[in-house]
């Protein structure tokens, strides 16, 4: 059974505090939007899909007990609070897309004279809760599509491991599993599907400095699932791909531009460069909500920069020389030219065909 990072019932929201993992499993109560903004900004919850779900559900929890005088006041509350939540971590596009969808819904409900303010509130709550269920279903579809794509490609290339009946070794970066989504995971969902098919020989995960999401979170999930797994340092990736017959790299995404350029956790770009050198397929696994067709390329993606302390300290212990300057971008952008395919819940697309394909899907 996969881990549960989000516990929700109408009027109640708790998130697994990922800052405490793997040493302690503790749930934090989110009572409203201010709590939601804080747990996202402090990275107690992280992962683009999970950020969107927690942000929207924090608003649902806040407005659930309230009695609004009229539909206008409810609409204003929804729009203002959602725009505020987007500011918690701006690189991840999922929160912005979810906010835009819910604001559009609120405006439509506001104009609908057939419903009153109470009905409007309940329709809004239903919509936010539907996002939670959809995320899990989308992740399972991503897992199935990704596993199929990897197995088909490596079978053609003859990169399955001898004597393992078509099983593969894969590498992943950061955390993209149940802890980063509503459940199952994106890139780690692909790994999970390979395991369910009996086709996962081994998974390697990077430590993912400076926040150590790979060492703290992905390793935690892999041990929990009892998958055959090995943790490697970020600086070991080139040696790993040269020595260990890795069949594919699969990572997540915080924002994908319309040309396929992908913003993901810092370190992703260099892994893609190394994978290209070693002729290892490099896949991005992301829901359609992570694809931003309004952005033409990666140069237009805003990259969040984090505090120096995340680099200079581990917990309360300083590991860097006092007085040293730090540069700590949370994400980098991998050019589309390094990406083999973008795995979504609706299929796997080459970066060059992404914009046209997604536009058609959204119009259908």
Curated annotation (Swiss-Prot):
SUPFAM superfamilies: NagB/RpiA/CoA transferase-like. The active site is at residue 254. Pfam families: IF-2B. It catalyses: 5-(methylsulfanyl)-alpha-D-ribose 1-phosphate = 5-(methylsulfanyl)-D-ribulose 1-phosphate. Pathway: Amino-acid biosynthesis; L-methionine biosynthesis via salvage pathway; L-methionine from S-methyl-5-thio-alpha-D-ribose 1-phosphate: step 1/6. GO terms for cellular component: cytoplasm; nucleus. The keyword Amino-acid biosynthesis applies. It is an enzyme of class 5 (isomerase). Its EC number is 5.3.1.23. It comes from the Eukaryota. Its main location: cytoplasm. Keywords: Amino-acid biosynthesis, Cytoplasm, Isomerase, Methionine biosynthesis, Nucleus. The record marks 174 as: Transition state stabilizer. It is found in: Cytoplasm; Nucleus. Signal peptide: none annotated. One of its GO terms (biological process) is L-methionine salvage from methylthioadenosine. GO terms for molecular function: S-methyl-5-thioribose-1-phosphate isomerase activity. Belongs to the eIF-2B alpha/beta/delta subunits family. MtnA subfamily. HAMAP family: Salvage_MtnA (MF_01678). Catalyzes the interconversion of methylthioribose-1-phosphate (MTR-1-P) into methylthioribulose-1-phosphate (MTRu-1-P). This is Methylthioribose-1-phosphate isomerase.
């Amino acid at each position: 059974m996969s881990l549960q990072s989000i516990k929700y019932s109408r009027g109640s929201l708790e998130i697994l505090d990922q800052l405490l993992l793997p040493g302690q499993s503790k749930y934090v109560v989110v009572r409203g939007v201010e709590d939601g903004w804080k747990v996202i900004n402090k990275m107690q919850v992280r992962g683009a899909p999970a950020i969107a779900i927690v942000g929207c559900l924090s608003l649902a929890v806040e407005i659930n007990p309230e009695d609004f005088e009229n539909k206008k006041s409810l609409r204003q509350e929804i729009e203002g609070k959602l725009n505020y939540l987007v500011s918690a971590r701006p690189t991840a596009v999922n929160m912005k897309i979810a906010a835009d969808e819910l604001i559009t819904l609120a405006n439509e409900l506001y104009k609908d004279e057939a419903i009153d303010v109470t009905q409007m509130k309940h329709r809004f709550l239903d919509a936010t809760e539907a996002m939670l269920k959809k995320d899990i279903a989308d992740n399972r579809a991503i897992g199935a599509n990704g596993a199929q794509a990897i197995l088909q490609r490596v079978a053609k290339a003859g990169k399955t491991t001898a004597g393992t009946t078509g099983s593969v070794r894969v590498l992943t970066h950061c955390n993209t599993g149940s802890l980063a989504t509503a459940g199952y995971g994106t890139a780690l969902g692909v790994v999970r599907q390979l395991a369910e098919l009996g086709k996962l020989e081994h998974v390697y995960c990077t430590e993912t400095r400076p926040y150590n999401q790979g060492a703290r979170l992905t390793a935690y999930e892999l041990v929990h699932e009892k998958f055959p797994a090995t943790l490697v340092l970020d600086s070991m990736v080139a040696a790993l791909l040269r020595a260990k017959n890795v069949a594919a790299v699969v990572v997540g995404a915080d924002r994908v531009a319309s040309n396929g350029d992908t913003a993901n956790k810092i370190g992703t770009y260099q892994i893609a460069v190394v994978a290209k050198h070693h002729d290892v397929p490099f896949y991005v696994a992301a829901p359609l909500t992570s694809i931003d067709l309004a952005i033409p390329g990666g140069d237009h993606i805003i990259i969040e920069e984090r505090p120096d302390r995340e680099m200079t300290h581990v917990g309360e212990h300083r590991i860097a020389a006092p007085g040293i300057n730090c540069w700590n971008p949370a994400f980098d952008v991998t050019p589309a030219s390094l990406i083999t395919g973008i795995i979504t819940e609706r299929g796997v697309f080459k970066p060059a065909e992404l914009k046209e394909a997604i536009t058609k899907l959204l119009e259908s």
